[in-house]
Amino acid sequence: MFDIGFLELAVIAVIGLIVIGPERLPEAVRSGATWMAKIRKMMRDTRAEIEVQIGADEIRRELHNEQVMKSLEALKVTKDDIQQHILDADRKMMLEQEAEEAKLQTPVSRRVAGDDPTLGTDDNVFTDPSYAHPPEEPSKVEADTSAETPQANNQDQQPTTKTEPANDR
């Protein structure tokens, strides 16, 4: 409140000692201190009364609350942005995973077929009547011929030409 340094206090003490005298100086200091305490108390009470009348505490609280609410709003916006980024990344990852699963679930013949939609499809399984009945059993003759050795089968498939060895005698 008062900005009094050591030098100013020394000057006031010397003037008080000269004016009041050494006998009454301690009593004057005590009465001055009590008057200062009463003035401070009166100023403190007046300030508190003015603050109550104006509502300074409420204004401070409201200002503080407004600042807190603004920072909360900024945090909510940041939180929403982060959640949106997380959801977008999660959706992207789910789509990639579903695409990978779909790729793994497609038959090999379809993947080999490429762009030709007719290759590798089994759509005619239900419409073609030849699929409705199992193939006929081979007759006994066919079964007996198929049981022959593979060498005999190879001879049937390839024409044989017999070459006679040349006699050198």
From Swiss-Prot:
GO molecular function, one term: protein transmembrane transporter activity
Chain's role: Part of the twin-arginine translocation (Tat) system that transports large folded proteins containing a characteristic twin-arginine motif in their signal peptide across membranes. Together with TatC, TatB is part of a receptor directly interacting with Tat signal peptides. TatB may form an oligomeric binding site that transiently accommodates folded Tat precursor proteins before their translocation.
Biased composition range(s): Polar residues: 146-169
Gene this chain is encoded by: tatB
Transmembrane helix as UniProt keyword: yes
Organism expressing this protein natively: Saccharophagus degradans (strain 2-40 / ATCC 43961 / DSM 17024)
Gene Ontology cellular component list: TAT protein transport complex
Assembly notes: The Tat system comprises two distinct complexes: a TatABC complex, containing multiple copies of TatA, TatB and TatC subunits, and a separate TatA complex, containing only TatA subunits. Substrates initially bind to the TatABC complex, which probably triggers association of the separate TatA complex to form the active translocon.
Protein name per Swiss-Prot or TrEMBL: Sec-independent protein translocase protein TatB
Predominant place of localization: membrane
